[in-house]
Curated annotation (Swiss-Prot):
Source organism (scientific name): Homo sapiens (Human)
Name listed for the protein in its UniProt record: Neutrophil cytosol factor 1
Compartment(s): Cytoplasm, Cytosol; Membrane
Alphabetic keyword roster: Chronic granulomatous disease, Cytoplasm, Disease variant, Lipid-binding, Membrane, Phosphoprotein, Repeat, SH3 domain
Biased composition (Basic residues): 309-318
Tissue expression profile of the protein: Detected in peripheral blood monocytes and neutrophils (at protein level).
Membrane topology: Peripheral membrane protein
Gene name, Swiss-Prot/TrEMBL: NCF1
Residues found modified as Phosphoserine: S303, S304, S320, S328, S345, S348
């Protein structure tokens, strides 16, 4: 078994807690060497104490001997009173700090002090109980990772979803569900695996097992884009259902509809169908890195879930495979017509000249003059020839 180390640390946001007194904790998603992902909570005072100890352990890299040799990032000291504004404004600094830590030499980025600090503690597993008078308020980071004072104006109410069927977890990072369980969604990944919490549990759940409480439809699903986005398959997949597409690793496709359940509609030549999004990578990006980040299989599709039970009277609104195919074919035909030169479009300068000549009006043919007019206006020689002919 290899050495333990951290691959990546992402700041998810922060929580405003009221027990035992009001304070703020930051939420970090820590990805370990075995591709497991854990959420940990740390106060900024804890982070700053960790930072001070790290500088003492590596004085040269901290610039204590020569400031020019410093590679350990700076971290401002906490203030006497840190309010919500300070907690918000500090998120950008912490994001850069964690990113820099992971890029340091392994003797620092994999040292026991750093690994121990980001390991899951018993307190990280304690969630607020139902009998608490005031539950924590969750503030999530924007998608682009940049936080300003205007990005977060109030507590973000986590979206609530309901399980439509039982789900048995297949790894330690997942969470088991029973039909009717209500969960809060912390993160919606494009892979179709959502990070959720429920009472004293947290973990990844296939989005296909969840439905919104107020409607069967997912309001955040984008509209189809029949122009398509170029993607490359980073892992081979063989279709299981009739409306899916089989691809080999390295095949290029166009994505025409990105659905949140992790099954995107793709176009390969004139064929359309579903394909797991976690096996796709945008064209032109590093494929090897994306392949290393595949940590679990594709999530199951809702059509494959047995004994699914929805609380809604009507079913979800989904385009059929025929509708995708018709709309895609219609778009491709229109694009080909626009790209093909029209009958009035000249193909070369010579053709343009011929077209111009053909478009000019032809001169009118004058009427034949009468015999009297010819005799009156012709020369004497012509008159003698006409007279001899008669």
């Amino acid at each position: 078994m290899g050495d333990t180390f951290i691959r990546h640390i992402a700041l998810l946001g922060f929580e405003k807690r009221f027990v035992p007194s009001q304070h703020y904790v930051y939420m970090f998603l820590v990805k370990w060497q075995d591709l497991s992902e854990k959420v940990v909570y740390r106060r900024f005072t804890e982070i700053y104490e960790f930072h001070k100890t790290l500088k003492e352990m590596f004085p040269i890299e901290a610039g204590a001997i020569n400031p020019e040799n410093r590679i350990i990032p700076h971290l401002p000291a906490p203030k006497w009173f840190d309010g919500q504004r300070a907690a918000e404004n500090r998120q950008g600094t912490l994001t850069e700090y964690c990113s820099t830590l992971m890029s340091l030499p392994t003797k620092i980025s994999r040292c026991p002090h750093l690994l121990d600090f980001f390991k899951v503690r018993p307190d990280d597993l304690k969630l607020p109980t139902d009998n608490q008078t005031k539950k924590p308020e969750t503030y999530l980071m924007p998608k682009d990772g940049k936080s300003t004072a205007t990005d977060i104006t109030g507590p973000i109410i986590l979206q609530t979803y309901r399980a439509i069927a039982n789900y048995e977890k297949t790894s330690g990072s997942e969470m088991a569900l029973s039909t009717g369980d209500v969960v809060e969604v912390v993160e919606k990944s494009e892979s179709g695996w959502w990070f959720c919490q429920m009472k004293a549990k947290r973990g990844w759940i296939p989005a296909s097992f969840l439905e919104p409480l107020d409607s069967p439809d997912e309001t955040e699903d984008p509209e189809p884009n029949y122009a398509g986005e170029p993607y490359v398959a980073i892992k081979a997949y063989t279709a299981v259902e009739g409306d899916e597409v089989s691809l080999l690793e390295g095949e290029a496709v166009e994505v025409i509809h990105k659905l949140l359940d992790g099954w995107w509609v793709i176009r390969k030549d004139d064929v359309t169908g579903y394909f797991p999004s976690m096996y796709l990578q945008k064209s032109g990006q590093d494929v090897s890195q994306a392949q290393r980040q595949i940590k679990r299989g594709a999530p199951p599709r809702r059509s494959s879930i047995r004994n699914a039970h929805s609380i809604h009277q009507r079913s979800r609104k989904r385009l059929s495979q025929d509708a995708y195919r018709r709309n895609s074919v219609r778009f491709l035909q229109q694009r080909r017509r626009q790209a093909r030169p029209g009958p009035q479009s000249p193909g070369s300068p010579l053709e343009e000249e011929r077209q111009t000549q053909r478009s000019k009006p032809q001169p009118a043919v004058p009427p034949r003059p009468s015999a009297d007019l010819i005799l009156n206006r012709c020369s004497e020689s012509t008159k003698r020839k006409l007279a001899s002919a008669v």
